[in-house]
C-alpha cells in the first residue's frame, strides 16, 4: 500500500504551483501508520518533512466547534439560544436583513455551527460592486481583519441567502457554507471566556490532549517545534501573519492532527464523551452555488462544525468509496476519519486557493487503504 500512498503524495506535489505536500494515513488500531512529505517547506529550500507544521485553514472549524461544545457542557453557552445573547449589541444590529425583516435574533448558536443561518460569507460572497473581500485582502497585503469590519461587510455590502432554518424539520434544510458563522462563534468564545482565541484553544484543547506542536497565530506551541511551512500563492510565497491571526486558523503537524481527530471522534476532547455525537446527529447537504465556486458545496454534508464527504454511487459505479467525516480547508488541507474502513488521514499543500484538492485525493486514499485491508483471494 505504501507505493500507492506515495503515488498520491507525488500527484499532490506535482500539481501546478504546489511547492510541497504532506500526507498521513493511519489505521484505527495503529497497526498501519504512514507519514510522508515532499518538496520545499519555504523559499530557502528547507525540505518539507512529516514533522513540519503547516497551516490547517478551515480544518480549525473542528477545534472551534469542540470548544463551543465544551462551553455547552459547562452551561456557559446554550445551542438553541440566540447568538446575540453572547456578543455585544453592536455586532448583532441588522446583520440578517432579508425582504425588509431583521432575523438576526432568530439565529441560534446551533445555526452558526450548522451553517444554517443564511448569513453571507464575508470572504467569498461577491458584493454588487467591487471584488470579493478575499480578493481585496490578497491584493492589499497583510493587515488586521477585525470583527467589526467583518460585520460591516456582511451588513452593508452583502445580503443573506435564506432565513435561519428549522433544524428540527423532517424535510430538506438549506445550508450554505459561510466563514461569517465561525467568526461569530469565535466572538462568542472570546466574549464568554474573556480571553483571546490563541489562549482559549491552548487551555481547552491543546494542553488537555497533549497537542504539543499546534498553535494559533499570536500564540506559541506547547513544545519547541520546527518553523511552520510557508503558505504559497502559486510559486510565490504568501506571508500575512496579521491576517492569519485575525482569522484564528491554526498551525499543526500531521501527528497532532490525527491525535486531535481521534480525541474528537472518541469523545476524549470533551468532559462527557457523548458530547461528540452531537456533532454528527444530523447531516444537511450543501447546494451548488455557481456564484461562489470556491465555497464547499454539493455533495458535501455538514453537521455541527464537521463535514461528511462521499461521492455518489453513480459517480464511481465500479469502485465506490465510503464516506469520510472531518473537515477540509481552502489551502488544500484535510483531516478525515472513515468509520467504515477505520482509517484516519490528513494532509495539505499550503496553497492559498486549493480547496478542491482534498476531494480529489481522498477517493484515491480510500481505495488504496481498502485494497490493503481486503484478504487475498482464496486459491481453493
Where are these regions (language model features)?
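Short, surface-exposed beta-strand/loop micro-motifs that present aromatic residues
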Residues: 249, 323-326, 331-344
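Short, surface-exposed loop or secondary-structure junction motifs
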Residues: 95-323
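Short, well-ordered beta-strand elements
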Residues: 32-35, 335-351
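Hydrophobic (often cysteine-bearing) scaffold residues that line and stabilize catalytic clefts
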Residues: 5, 56, 60, 64, ...
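Short active-site loop at a secondary-structure junction
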Residues: 16-20, 44-112, 165-179, 245-248, ...
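Short, gly/Ser/Thr-rich active-site loops of penicillin-recognizing serine hydrolases
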Residues: 282-292, 354-380
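Residue-level preference for non-acidic, small/hydrophobic
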Residues: 9, 23, 29, 61-64, ...
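Short, conserved catalytic-motif segment at the N-terminal edge
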Residues: 2-56, 76-77, 92-93, 218, ...
